[in-house]
Amino acid sequence: MAELPQSRINERNITSEMRESFLDYAMSVIVSRALPDVRDGLKPVHRRILYGLNEQGMTPDKPYKKSARIVGDVMGKYHPHGDSSIYEAMVRMAQDFSYRYPLVDGQGNFGSMDGDGAAAMRYTEARMTKITLELLRDINKDTIDFIDNYDGNEREPSVLPARFPNLLVNGAAGIAVGMATNIPPHNLTEVIDGVLSLSKNPDITINELMEDIQGPDFPTAGLVLGKSGIRRAYETGRGSIQMRSRAEIEERGGGRQRIVVTEIPFQVNKARMIEKIAELVRDKKIDGITDLRDETSLRTGVRVVIDVRKDANASVILNNLYKQTPLQTSFGVNMIALVNSRPKLINLKEALIHYLEHQKTVVRRRTEYNLKKARDRAHILEGLRIALDHIDEIITTIRESDTDKIAMASLQERFKLTERQAQAILDMRLRRLTGLERDKIESEYNELLEYIKELEEILADEEVLLQLVRDELTEIKERFGDERRTEIQLGGLEDLEDEDLIPEEQIVITLSHNNYIKRLPVSTYRSQNRGGRGIQGMNTLDEDFVSQLVTMSTHDHVLFFTNKGRVYKLKGYEVPELSRQSKGIPIINAIELENDETISTMIAVKDLESEEDYLVFATKQGIVKRSSLSNFSRINKNGKIAINFKEDDELIAVRLTTGNEDILIGTAHASLIRFSESTLRPLGRTAAGVKGISLREGDTVVGLDVADSESEDEVLVVTENGYGKRTPVSEYRLSNRGGKGIKTATITERNGNIVCITTVTGEEDLMVVTNAGVIIRLDVHDISQNGRAAQGVRLMKLGDGQFVSTVAKVNEEDDNEENADEAQQSTTTETADVEEVVDDQTPGNAIHTEGDAEMESVESPENDDRIDIRQDFMDRVNEDIESASDNEEDSDE
C-alpha cells in the first residue's frame, strides 16, 4: 500500500478524538436534524421542503408536480441526506391523520392509519396547501436571515416567517442524541387566542392561558381524559396526557349490542389495534366478543365494529379494551425546542413568548423593508415630478447632449437631481408626458407619502407594531380556524380500576355456619308466597348450613365483623361467584381469620370515608358501642380490632347508622329495648362499649337494628320454628339505655326462641334460611302485622330437625325478565332453567313449586289454616293481656 504524505497524517489521542467527534455529531443531530425551532416549529428537513416548494412556485393554485422532482430539487440544493428521509418527511406533512393542519397537498397514495406506506415518489404528486403560504409569507421581504447551503452555492432560510404558531398547532416529534421532543398538536383558533391574550397581558399565567388553549387537539380527534396531565405539561414542559378512542354502545336487535369505534387515539395504528383485540379474544383474555370487523371508508370515516355476545356486558368489555389495547393510550409530552440554536425545555407560556417575539421581529423587518422600498419609489417620483414641471428644458438638455452619460450629468447639475432620478428621467417613455400620466404620478406620490408616514409610525411605536401583529393573526384565525376535534372530558381518570372492568350488579353474598362463602346474582332467588318451601340455596356439608347473607353491589365494600371483635374488608367482586348449589369456598381463603374466629355480621358499604355515618355494635352480654365509619376506611388484609370486650363475651351484630336514629336491641327471650343513638358517645375503633340492655338470667342478645325516631317502620320478629310477625316500631316506647326492655313476643314451645329481630319498611323481601340450607324469599307484606305479645304466623314449613338459622332483608326489584321467566315456567311442563325447591320429607330432592296438587295434599293445608285461625285468636287475647302487664314491666326497668 502506498504511503500517504506525512502532511496528511495527524496523530491524536483516540480518547480525545472520540469525545470531540461524538460531541460534534451530537450537536449536529440536535441543531440540524432532530429538533424543531421554537419560532416556526419546523425541523431543517421540513423547512427545506417547504422552501423548495415555494422556490418552484408550487402554490395551491398551480398544478401538482411529481414528488420525485420535489425531492430531487430539495436534496440537490439543500438537504444532501438521501431521498428517503426527504420523501418520508413530505409524506407526513401531507397526511391529515398526522398533521392537524397538513402543509403539503398530496395527490395519490400517501399512506393510511393502518400503517400502509405511501406509493413510490415517482407515482405521487404534491404542492403546497393554502395554510403553508402563511408560513412563507413575506419571506422575500428581508423578514428572516438566509444562510449558505451545504456547499455554499445556494442560500436557504434559517427560519420561516411563520405567520401562525406552527410549533403548537402541528406539534413536533424527534429523537436527538441524549434528548427527544414530543409536542402535541393544538387547535389553530385556540393557540392564536392564547397569543393574543399574551400580547395584551405579558404577566398572564398558564392557568389563564388554559382558558384559551384547552389542551391538545389531535387530527384523529378522540378523547382526552382530564386536565391534570395537560396542566402539568403546560406548566413544566413535561407530562402525560391520557387519550381514548370515541366508542359508542349500540343496540343491534334481539337484545344484542355492539361497540362502534369512530375515533382512535393519535398515532395509533388502526390495523395493529384490531389485531391486538383479536389476539386477546383468541387467548380468552377478553370474553364476550363474537365478531370484529373494520368498516372504515372514505364515506363513513373510521368505523371499527365489535359485536358483543347477548349475555355479555358491553360496558365491561369496552373498559377491558381500554385497559388492554391501544383504544386508550397516553401521549408523553416533552416540549424541547431550539431557542437561539440551543435545545431548551419550554412550557406553554415560553413557547408563546418566543413565537410572539419572532412575529414582532418579522413585522418590524418587513416594515423596514417596505419603508425602504417606499422611500426609494418616492425619491424616483420626486425626480419625475421635476421633469414634468420642466419638460421643455429637460428635452432640450437631452437633445444637446452627445451621450447619455453627458445627458445624465447635465440633468443632475442643472436640476439638482440624483443619479437615480436622472436615470429614471432618461428611461421615461414619451407617453408619460400626457396629462393623465402626470396625474397618476402625482397621485402615486401623495399616496406614498401617506404610506411612508404609516410605516414610520409602526416603527416608532411598539404598541402600534404589536397591534399589527394581532390584526394579522386574527385574520389568519378567521380564514383557517376551525372547531376543536378532540373532546376533553373533565374529571377524567387516570388508570382504570378493577371496578371499571367488572359489571356492577346486585348480588347476594352467603356465608355458611362452617364459614364457606360465595356470591350469587340477587335474581337467583325469586319471590314466593308465604308458606312456600323455598329453593335450594346451596348443597351443604354434614352439619353445615347458611348462617348469613347480605345483598349489595359488586362494587361495594363488605365489612366482616367477627365474634372476637375484629373487622376485615373485601370488595363485592372479590368474593367468588359460584353456582346456586355450590357450598362456596372457605372464608379463610378470602380473609385471614384467626383460630376459632367466626363471622358475626357482614355489612355492605359504598363509601368508607364517610364522616356522617356510624357503626353501632352489640355484644352477646348486652354491651353497645358507636364508632365513626371513617375509622374503618383503612382495613388491611390481616384485619383490625373493631371492639374490645371481656373474654366471656362476643360480638353479636353491627349496624350502619346515620347518627340520628334509635337503637333497638332484642334478646332470645323476647325482650326489646329502644333508646336514642345520641345517648351513645362516639368512641374510637378499639374502644370497649357501654351497657345497652340489662339481661335476665339465661337470656342473650340475638338482634340489633336501628329505626328513625318518627319511623313508620315495623319490628320484624322471626322465631327458630319458622314463625314471624310485624309490629309497628311506634309500639316500642323510647326508654333509657341499660334498661331491661319490654316484651316483643310470646315465646312458646310451638314457635321457639327468637332468632331474628330487625326492622322493615314494607318495601323489602325477606330471605329466611334454615340449617339445612333451604332459602325462601318472602314479600314482607305477606307477613301478618300483630301486637307485641303475639306469637306470629307461620312463615316457612320446616322438616324434621330443621330450624331457622338466619334472616336477611332484600330490596324489592321490578325484574321484568324474571317475571317473564316465571310466566314461562307456569305454562311449560318442563324447562332446563326452572328453579327448584326442597321437599321437607326428602331434603335435597328437587320438585316444582307452585300448583303442585300432590304436594298440597301431602302437607294438608286445611289443617294449617285451622292452626293459623286459632293462633290469630290467641294473638288477640295476648294483645289484651299485654296492655295490663306493661306497667309491671316498666317498674322492672
UniProtKB/Swiss-Prot annotation:
Its main location: cytoplasm. The active site is at Y123. Residues 812-821, 852-862, 880-893 have a biased composition (Acidic residues). It catalyses: ATP-dependent breakage, passage and rejoining of double-stranded DNA. One of its GO terms (biological process) is DNA topological change. Residues 35-501 form the Topo IIA-type catalytic domain. Pfam families: DNA_gyraseA_C, DNA_topoisoIV. Residues 863-879 have a biased composition (Basic and acidic residues). The keyword Ion transport does not apply. HAMAP family: GyrA. A type II topoisomerase that negatively supercoils closed circular double-stranded (ds) DNA in an ATP-dependent manner to modulate DNA topology and maintain chromosomes in an underwound state. Negative supercoiling favors strand separation, and DNA replication, transcription, recombination and repair, all of which involve strand separation. Also able to catalyze the interconversion of other topological isomers of dsDNA rings, including catenanes and knotted rings. Type II topoisomerases break and join 2 DNA strands simultaneously in an ATP-dependent manner. PANTHER family: DNA GYRASE SUBUNIT A, CHLOROPLASTIC_MITOCHONDRIAL, DNA GYRASE/TOPOISOMERASE SUBUNIT A. This is DNA gyrase subunit A.
